[in-house]
Regions:
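C-terminal non-catalytic interaction/assembly regions of soluble proteins
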Residues: 255-406
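Short glycine-rich or small-residue beta-strand-to-loop segments that form or flank ligand, phosphate
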Residues: 4-14, 73-79, 104-110, 181-186, ...
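N-terminal phosphate-binding or glycine-rich loops at protein starts, especially the Walker A/P-loop
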Residues: 1-52
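Accessory alpha-helical/coil subdomains and C-terminal extensions
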Residues: 40, 97, 105-110, 116-131, ...
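Short, ordered loop/turn segments at secondary-structure junctions
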Residues: 10-12, 40-46, 79-80, 111-112, ...
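Glycine-rich oxoanion-binding loops at beta->alpha junctions
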Residues: 50-104, 113, 141, 163-166
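Short glycine/serine/threonine-rich phosphate/pyrophosphate-binding segments
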Residues: 14-24, 47-48, 91-92, 112-120, ...
Length: 406
């Protein structure tokens, strides 16, 4: 019997999730204990439909090296959620397919829902006496997985966000003879890690973004307007960063308040997301120049701002996952253990995936100012090491040269 390795990607992509794939695949191909490395096309959902590929040719033709610096999910993704009931027929169907393909090692690269899949598969394996070793490799730009210092994908997304906010601030400062407000809406529905990283854009104390709002603290539109008025007495060009999920603390997202704002000359509601709502609110209450910007998916797919630290850790976590499985670990997620901020020292370990899935890690309240409008120095010490170093992405005809499935 062969001892084959099966790997897949799931959930939203990141700029370095393929770095983790590179780590798993390269380590698997190099290890004599593993006979074949098989990729699942579109995760567990694709595997159920028998969509797989042999990963060995990618090393032979040089594609594997390009995969390392390609954003998105090379193998494709899915949002397939396995049933809670472990007696559901999908489980024996999956394990029958594992047997047919002689799978001894299963790796799933993803976030919270992916770790839920790892948990269910490993628990089912235990009930039927399967010796398949099942390991989760973390990824998420949201940085909200528990029991790990941070997650691959966050450092590059944070670097992109902070870089873009710094560029927006430079653009806004051009017309410094009239008051203006620029509102930057950043991903993060329940956790504000990405928005908090915008604080890294500041060149000095008091620099833009002057105001930063996270979903961890209840948001008051009235207090926001007063804070904007106060800050405009000190700077004419105000940049404000908000998480898309800012809310009133009682379950109502700010974007849901849009019906309270007026309509345009055609009777259309002036709304989309939280940023647009606040843009209209500032326009209505203060009557000054204001615009809102959504960073949106660029935060997770930009190769131009890859953090070398992030990419290196993504690949290393993939390699460590293979080693952990070969050492007999199963039902675990690779976690990141920080030993020091300065110098930055990181170690890898494993944590019980059942203690991770379906939980969220918020930005600590003590890292946010009491009025909820700024970020403290503790966060800066935490985040700054994660954005260090640049990555030279292969270029062709003046544009990034990415890998893609043929």
């Amino acid at each position: 019997m062969n001892h084959n390795l099966l790997v897949g990607q799931s959930g939203g992509p990141t700029a370095v999730i393929n770095g983790s794939l590179y780590g798993v695949v390269s380590e698997g191909l190099a290890n004599p204990e593993i006979d074949n490395v098989i990729g699942m096309i579109n995760g567990i959902e694709g595997f159920l439909a028998n969509h797989t590929m042999d990963m060995a040719p990618l090393k032979e033709n040089g594609e594997l090296e390009r995969i390392r610096t390609t954003p998105g999910s090379y193998l494709g993704s899915c949002r397939y959620k396995l049933p809670e009931d472990l007696s559901d027929p999908v489980y024996p169907e999956l394990f029958q397919k594992f047997t047919e393909k002689e799978i001894s090692y299963f790796f799933y690269i993803g976030g919270n829902d992916s770790m839920d899949t790892v948990s269910k598969l490993s628990r089912y394996a235990a009930t039927v006496g399967s010796d398949i070793r099942i390991i989760g490799v973390p990824k998420t730009i949201d940085n909200d997985l528990v029991l790990t210092d941070h997650t691959p994908g966050y450092g590059s997304a944070a670097k992109y966000g902070a870089s873009t906010v710094r560029e927006i601030a430079i653009d806004a400062s051009v017309y410094d003879n009239k008051p203006s407000v620029t509102i930057v809406e950043i991903m993060g529905r329940h956790a504000g890690w990405l928005t908090a990283a915008s604080v890294l854009a500041r060149k000095f104390k008091g620099d833009n973004p002057v105001l930063i709002y996270l979903p961890e603290v209840a948001f008051s539109p009235d207090a926001f307007i007063e804070k904007v008025k106060e800050k405009l007495t000190k700077t004419s060009n105000l940049v404000v960063c908000i998480s898309e999920g800012i809310n009133d603390g009682n379950g109502t997202f700010v974007c849901e308040l849009a019906s309270d704002v007026g309509t345009d000359t055609f009777g259309h509601k002036m709304l989309t997301g939280s940023g647009k709502y606040l843009e209209n609110l500032v326009k209505e209450k203060l009557g000054i120049k204001v615009r809102s910007v959504e960073l949106n998916v660029c935060q997770r797919c930009s190769s131009s701002c890859l953090s070398a630290t992030d990419l290196d850790e993504a690949a290393a976590s993939g390699r460590f996952a293979v080693s952990a499985a070969l050492d007999g670990e199963t039902g675990k997620m690779i976690n990141f253990i920080r030993k020091s901020d300065d110098p930055y020292i990181l170690e890898f370990g494993t944590a019980d995936v059942n203690e991770i899935c379906n939980k969220e890690k918020a930005v600590p309240e003590e890292w946010i100012t009491k009025d909820g409008s700024d970020i403290g120095d503790e966060f800066i010490a935490y985040a700054r090491p994660l954005i260090q170093g640049s990555v030279e992405v292969p270029m062709k005809d003046g544009l990034p040269y990415f890998a893609f499935r043929k």
